[in-house]
């Protein structure tokens, strides 16, 4: 169960809704990619995602400005610039955590990867995948189409066998995944990054049930668990809308339901061995601590990884 912020706006989501890359949930993928692009272009980056800038700038000039590592669109708002920088730091740390997760999974011999709600995730292109690795990317058809076409247009090629699976995670995605060549008998490395609040609580449970059912012994899963901070979301939304004309109200795009399962508890109760870390601790460990005066505005999340049928290492 999750404590809810009563000041959050009502969700605008509807059953069966869909989107392009600049609409609804698709636009949040652009926002995350903009943070990765800004981090990559900045000094001493934690991550390197040379594809993020291409994916963001191709969506329009306002998105390209959002990816500016100097955040020049906030030059006259020092507080907003610092708060936005903390958001970039969080995305960089989150990306770094899950990059390390995949590195560990590959060292364990896993060669089958599934990225749930892949959005503009470019790991199939930018990570060093061993020969024989297949990366399945599940997301809305138009989102996957945008990524594929944009990167092809710029001459980018995947570093692994990449298999897009255009299906909504609220639908029968296991059938679509299997049709794309997924083999449940092989250990799999799953990723659910920036996903859970965009699913209804019952769909989240079904997602974990299906992931578990499709996972052979030795499989791993990594998950980001985060809630919505009404104050920080409102301020971020207003800054982007007023200065860039980008209307991306994340709180209105997520489901705020009191019966949502605790991801770590659910996985533990279904045979997974879970290791988790608070994002603030991970940010401090990597040299990107949240300034004390911005603590109330910064994201709070838990980053976790889990193994099925073995220790977490």
Swiss-Prot record:
GO molecular function: methyltransferase activity
High-level lineage: Bacteria, Bacillati, Actinomycetota, Actinomycetes, Mycobacteriales
Protein function: Exhibits S-adenosyl-L-methionine-dependent methyltransferase activity.
Family: Belongs to the UPF0677 family.
Residues reported to bind S-adenosyl-L-methionine: 139, 168-169
Record-linked InterPro entries: Ppm1/Ppm2/Tcmp, SAM-dependent_MTases_sf, SAM_mthyl_Trfase_ML2640-like
Organism from which the protein derives: Mycobacterium avium (strain 104)
Broadest EC class assigned to this enzyme: transferase
Tree of life domain: Bacteria
S-adenosyl-L-methionine listed as a keyword: yes
Identification of the protein by name: Putative S-adenosyl-L-methionine-dependent methyltransferase MAV_5150
Keywords per UniProt: Methyltransferase, S-adenosyl-L-methionine, Transferase
Matches recorded under PANTHER family: S-ADENOSYL-L-METHIONINE-DEPENDENT METHYLTRANSFERASE YKTD-RELATED, S-ADENOSYL-L-METHIONINE-DEPENDENT METHYLTRANSFERASES SUPERFAMILY PROTEIN
Example GO BP: methylation
This protein's record includes keyword Methyltransferase: yes
Pfam family, one: LCM
EC number(s) given by UniProt: 2.1.1.-
């Amino acid at each position: 169960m999750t404590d809810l912020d009563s000041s959050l706006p009502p969700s605008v989501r509807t059953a069966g809704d869909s989107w392009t890359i600049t609409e609804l949930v698709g636009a949040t993928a652009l926002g995350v990619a903009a943070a990765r692009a800004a981090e990559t272009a900045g000094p001493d980056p934690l991550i390197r995602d040379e594809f993020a800038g291409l994916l963001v700038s191709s969506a329009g000039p306002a998105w390209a400005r959002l990816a500016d590592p100097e955040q020049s669109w906030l030059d006259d708002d020092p507080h907003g610039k610092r708060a936005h920088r903390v958001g970039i730091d969080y995305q960089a740390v989150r990306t770094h955590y899950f990059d390390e997760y995949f590195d560990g999974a590959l060292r364990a011999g896993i060669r089958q990867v599934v990225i749930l709600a892949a959005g503009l995730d470019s790991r199939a292109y930018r990570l060093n995948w061993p020969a024989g690795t297949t990366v399945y990317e599940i997301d809305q058809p138009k989102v996957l189409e945008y990524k594929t076409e944009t990167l092809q247009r710029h001459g980018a090629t995947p570093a692994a066998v990449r298999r897009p699976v255009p299906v909504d995670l609220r639908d029968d995605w296991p059938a679509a995944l299997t049709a794309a060549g997924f083999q449940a008998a092989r250990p799999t490395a799953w990723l659910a990054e920036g996903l859970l609040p965009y699913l209804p609580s019952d769909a989240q449970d079904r997602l974990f049930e299906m992931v578990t059912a499709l996972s052979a012994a030795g499989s791993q899963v990594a998950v980001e668990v985060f809630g919505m901070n009404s104050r920080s979301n409102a301020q971020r939304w207003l800054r982007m809308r007023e200065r860039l004309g980008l209307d991306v109200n994340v709180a209105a795009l997520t489901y705020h339901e009191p019966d949502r399962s605790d991801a770590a508890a659910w996985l533990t109760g279904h045979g997974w061995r879970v290791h988790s870390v608070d994002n603030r601790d991970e940010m401090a460990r990597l040299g990107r601590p949240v300034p004390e005066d911005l603590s109330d505005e910064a994201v709070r999340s838990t980053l976790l990884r889990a193994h099925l049928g073995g220790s977490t290492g």
